[in-house]
Curated annotation (Swiss-Prot):
Source organism of this protein record: Schizosaccharomyces pombe (strain 972 / ATCC 24843) (Fission yeast)
GO CC term (a single one): nucleus
InterPro entries: DUF2458
KW Ion transport (keyword) present: no
Keyword Nucleotidyltransferase: no
Main localization of the protein described in the UniProt heading: cytoplasm
Keywords for this protein: Cytoplasm, Nucleus
Region spans: Disordered: 117-138
Pfam families assigned to the protein according to its UniProt record, in alphabetical order: DUF2458
Biased composition (Polar residues): 124-138
Cell compartments where the protein resides: Cytoplasm; Nucleus
Protein's name in the database: Uncharacterized protein C557.02c
Length: 203
């Protein structure tokens, strides 16, 4: 078992008020047969705490483990969201690499052609050489500007994706995320819960 998951399970166990001794003292023969049957979906739903009432990380931890055990299909939606995010970030990274390589190729080509343009045998006027230098500088500025615009666009798209993910967490009734202000920084408990979800989804 992953060490992070093991640590979280240990934390979950320590935060529970039910002990193994209490469980052993229960007289199983006193449980009616009708209650020993497999619980229905309705009963399972009601056995999980109301997410809106959860305000602390230990309570959220218990809720997530119960949700993962009883209704894993809900966390499956988060797994798809995580996969989509990773795929989008990978595409952005590849696109930026292609953009940088394109600019570097143009720069190398200019460096190759520059000795030819400065060859005295070609007898080019000095104003032509100055124009070439100015063109090179302008091209470099254009390339840097294009790269900066790409980075700014990625930042905007990342912020939009972040807000959409917060909305999905709220829609799935994930504790601590039911009423989140997009402009506020996440609390430490929210960050810990996100890390827990990442560990579970990556397991």
């Amino acid at each position: 078992m992953d060490k992070k998951i093991a640590d979280l399970l240990q934390e979950l166990q320590s935060s529970s008020n039910v002990t193994s001794n209490q469980l052993e003292n229960v007289d199983k023969s006193s449980i009616p047969l009708s209650k020993a049957r497999k619980p229905s979906d309705f009963e399972l739903n009601n056995s999980i705490e109301d997410a809106e009432k959860i305000k602390t990380y230990p309570a959220a931890l218990r809720y997530i483990f119960a949700l993962n055990s009883r209704h894993p299909e809900k966390l499956q939606k988060l797994r798809k969201m995580k996969a989509m995010q990773e795929r989008q970030e990978r595409n952005w990274s590849l696109e930026r690499q292609r953009l940088v390589q394109h600019f570097e190729s143009k720069t190398k080509l200019q460096e190759i052609l520059k000795p030819l343009s400065s060859d005295p045998k070609l007898k080019q006027p000095s104003n032509c050489l100055n124009d070439q230098t100015n063109n090179d500088s302008a091209q470099t500025l254009d390339d840097n500007r294009a790269l900066q615009e790409f980075d700014e666009q990625v930042v905007q798209l990342t912020n939009r994706m972040y807000k959409e993910q917060l909305a999905i967490l709220a829609d799935l009734k994930i504790p601590l995320f039911l009423s989140v202000n997009n402009d506020e920084e996440l609390s430490e408990d929210q960050k810990r819960l996100l890390q827990l979800l990442q560990d579970l989804l990556g397991a």
